[in-house]
Amino acid sequence: MGLAIAHQLARRGRRVQVISRRRSEAAGFVAAGMLAPHAEGLSGDLLRLGQASLELIPRWVAQIELDGGMTCGLRSCGIVVPFCSSEERDQYPTATWGLSLNRPQLEQDIPGIGSDWQAGLLFEQDGQIDNRRQLMRALERACTGLGVQFMEGTEVLE
């Protein structure tokens, strides 16, 4: 989050300094990188926010890739959510946004899936980004290129 904010401020011509105890502890290095409001089964305002984010992310990533000169690993690959039964699948909060899968279709999408899983939902609109290996590195490079200063090894207490 911090590097994303730093990047946007620097793009607007602001002087930015990122203070960090250890950059390797940043949320981006531990988060899974799922861009999946539908697969997560969100609802209400949180789902709407996630859906809006899915529309904005490609443009945001393109800015980072342009400024950093490297790819961020954004993939609009879809995400499959398996279920033990078709009833469970059909009751999932975001089922209406997914493509229903039966057992053979589920096996095709997830080879070797255990026999407990009998149904699934494919959320084609969901995707992922490679946080750890690509996005964070691209953000660091983009920030550096825009003049962001880094103060590593400093703990902020207040």
Question: What is each stretch, according to the model?
Answer:
Residues 2-3:
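N-terminal Rossmann-fold NAD(P) dinucleotide-binding loop
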Residues 6, 10, 142:
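Gly/Ala-rich phosphate-binding loop of Rossmann-like dinucleotide-binding domains
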Residues 10-30:
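Glycine-rich FAD pyrophosphate-binding loop
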Residues 19, 80-83, 124:
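Short hydrophobic segments within beta-strands
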Residues 34-109:
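Dinucleotide-binding Rossmann-like beta1-alpha1 core, especially the glycine-rich loop
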Residues 75, 112-118:
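A short, glycine/Asx- and small/polar-enriched loop/turn
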Residues 121-158:
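Helical element adjacent to the flavin cofactor pocket in flavoenzyme catalytic cores
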